[in-house]
């Protein structure tokens, strides 16, 4: 449930993060996910974010098997805005440009689309327990038109997720966070 709406809770003015994840290592090497994200808090109630994700596939030949110089990839560029409507209640919207290049397999060429994500987050402190709190959020992702390949149009994996979290401090510098999420794929 932690979409861009969670930025209203951040106390820093801005931040940048990079992650790398080798994907399906036990299945086949060559899959990787690179993510670069940043945010900037304009003021106490407004924040903007930028992100870039790159998913690389292993090198393939023209049939999708083995190596022969074809490098499929997926790229997403994101820009978003988060706003704290009232104390403890935030909303967010993220615009994404999506590009998919299956490496010129057959007669295909790269395909692109756009999508939107929407989120809401409510958080609350637990009375009589310093630093403790809970939150609940809703996130709807990949709302947008189908992605257009040369010979087909495929629906984006639109999803809706709801989740909650509880932060429970147990020592001065430590806390336990319990979370639960439920998701449903719309398309």
What are these regions (language model features)?
Residues 1-187:
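Subset of outer-membrane beta-barrel
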């Amino acid at each position: 449930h932690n979409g861009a709406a969670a930025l209203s809770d951040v106390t820093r003015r801005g931040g940048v993060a990079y992650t790398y994840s080798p994907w399906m290592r036990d299945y086949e090497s060559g899959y990787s996910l690179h993510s670069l994200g940043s945010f900037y808090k304009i003021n106490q109630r407004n924040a903007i974010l930028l992100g870039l994700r790159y998913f690389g596939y292993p090198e393939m030949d023209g049939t999708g098997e083995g190596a022969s110089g074809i490098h499929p990839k997926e790229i997403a560029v994101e820009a978003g805005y988060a706003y704290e409507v009232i104390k403890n209640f935030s909303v967010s919207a993220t615009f994404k440009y999506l590009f998919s290049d299956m490496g010129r397999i057959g007669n295909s060429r790269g395909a692109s689309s756009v999508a939107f994500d929407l989120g809401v987050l409510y958080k609350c402190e637990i009375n009589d327990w310093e630093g403790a709190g809970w939150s609940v959020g809703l996130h709807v992702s990949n709302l947008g038109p189908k992605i257009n390949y040369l010979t087909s149009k495929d629906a984006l994996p639109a999803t809706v997720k709801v989740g909650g979290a509880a932060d429970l401090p147990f020592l001065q510098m430590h806390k336990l966070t319990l979370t639960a999420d439920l998701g449903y794929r719309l398309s």
